[in-house]
């Protein structure tokens, strides 16, 4: 199961998930000047970041919107980035947040679990119901693939829907998490985690222990670290024995060179930030 590969990557490299949410204005001007087109520029920047952080991260999350916004040349950079990650045997999360059902969802599954855009995991939105997850299950069962489904997110607007009362003392996010955790038990790996994971923001620490205990076999994709205010202490509460999830950081890693005032060595700065993040979380876990 792909869940086992993720667990083992975390054991080896730590919990950091490097977010390749690469906006053109994140790229240093002097690096940009080497390229005549945006596709090559984006891919080359990503490649530098990947090479610098590969051995200090569990996986890479590539947010497709940053590439779609540039049209075909952006999608070419997206394709090339995924291809390079596969070449490096890195685990890939395609952050696509699809949420349709039936035949449309089958096409999304085919698009992102096969071919040019093949990834190991994708993100999904469960708002239309559990039948929006069903078309991805054959890939989970037979093709070593996995999904991370939105459960309780880190944005302020999450309270508009995810926190609504659903009866019996539960909120909407509780019900979503429980349904996914139950389904996920059909796809458990040898380390006790499922290939059906949940996106759980780390900006609500007061709920962390309860969620970790209830969603016992669900690996968490944890956004909100760094730029959104989440700390190492916040993150540690969502993990179990230092595993059971990965922690995404995009801007804080990609833009580390600005904080370190070293545009020329942006990739090395990204590596330093990833190591610092990994070590801070490890220290918080031990406390």
From Swiss-Prot:
It catalyses: orotidine 5'-phosphate + H(+) = UMP + CO2. The keyword Lyase applies. Pathway: Pyrimidine metabolism; UMP biosynthesis via de novo pathway; UMP from orotate: step 2/2. The active site is at residue 97. Gene3D superfamilies: Aldolase class I. InterPro entries: Aldolase_TIM (IPR013785), OMPdecase_AS (IPR018089), OMPdecase_type-2 (IPR011995), OMPdeCOase_dom (IPR001754), RibuloseP-bd_barrel (IPR011060). Pfam families: OMPdecase. The keyword Flavoprotein does not apply. Keywords: Decarboxylase, Lyase, Pyrimidine biosynthesis. PROSITE patterns: OMPDECASE. GO terms for biological process: 'de novo' pyrimidine nucleobase biosynthetic process; 'de novo' UMP biosynthetic process. GO terms for molecular function: orotidine-5'-phosphate decarboxylase activity. Its EC number is 4.1.1.23. HAMAP family: OMPdecase_type2. Belongs to the OMP decarboxylase family. Type 2 subfamily. This is Orotidine 5'-phosphate decarboxylase.
